[in-house]
């Protein structure tokens, strides 16, 4: 019998984003990454500990696959019954042929094999956690840069507060 290791509660997205940035501040500073957080006060239901873990993995990937003058941008949007947290970097991107497989266990992709040593476990774990927590996860890359989005469902109460 396994106990669930998460607690979903109402969290202001900027708070979990700032916590994740603080967790990774040494890595970000050492690699001269410019960080921008667009904050419009959006709220979502989540387990902040695990969402921080997911964001730290995304930050780690952005640093690993950075270009000169690396930057990270966190932004939120509301579409229909969802709040979307997007993390965009200006790194080397992900080849189109690799995109469908980025969540597969052990998949390192072309860049993971040629540019950096990669285990292929990070995004796989993120996807598993998102599935457990009821959060959507998508990755988009158009050659240069990558955008990773966490998609939080919102209920009627939250929609009323934020709408």
Model-derived regions, located:
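Short conserved segments within the C-terminal catalytic ATPase subdomain
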Residues: 27-36
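Short helix-loop "hinge" at the ATP-lid/N-box region of the Bergerat-fold HATPase_c
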Residues: 62-63
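Short beta-strand/loop element within the Bergerat-fold HATPase_c
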Residues: 69-81
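Conserved micro-motifs of the catalytic ATP-binding
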Residues: 2-6, 39, 43-46
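Short conserved segment of the HATPase_c
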Residues: 94-107
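Acidic ATP/Mg2+-coordinating residue in the GHKL
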Residues: 89
């Amino acid at each position: 019998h396994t106990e669930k290791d998460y607690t979903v509660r109402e969290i202001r997205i900027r708070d979990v984003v700032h916590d994740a940035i603080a967790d990774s501040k040494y890595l970000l500073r050492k690699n001269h990454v410019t960080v921008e957080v667009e904050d419009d006060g959006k709220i979502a239901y989540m387990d902040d500990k695990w969402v921080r873990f997911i964001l730290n993995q995304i930050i780690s990937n952005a640093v690993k696959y950075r270009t000169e003058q690396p930057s990270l941008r966190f932004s939120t949007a509301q579409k229909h019954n969802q709040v979307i947290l997007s993390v965009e970097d200006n790194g080397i991107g992900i080849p189109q042929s690799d995109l469908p497989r980025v969540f597969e266990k052990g998949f390192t992709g072309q860049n993971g094999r040629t540019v950096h040593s990669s285990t292929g476990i990070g995004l796989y774990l993120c996807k598993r956690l998102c599935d457990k927590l009821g959060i959507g996860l998508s990755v988009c890359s158009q050659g240069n840069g990558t955008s990773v989005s966490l998609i939080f469902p919102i209920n009627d109460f939250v929609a009323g507060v934020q709408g």
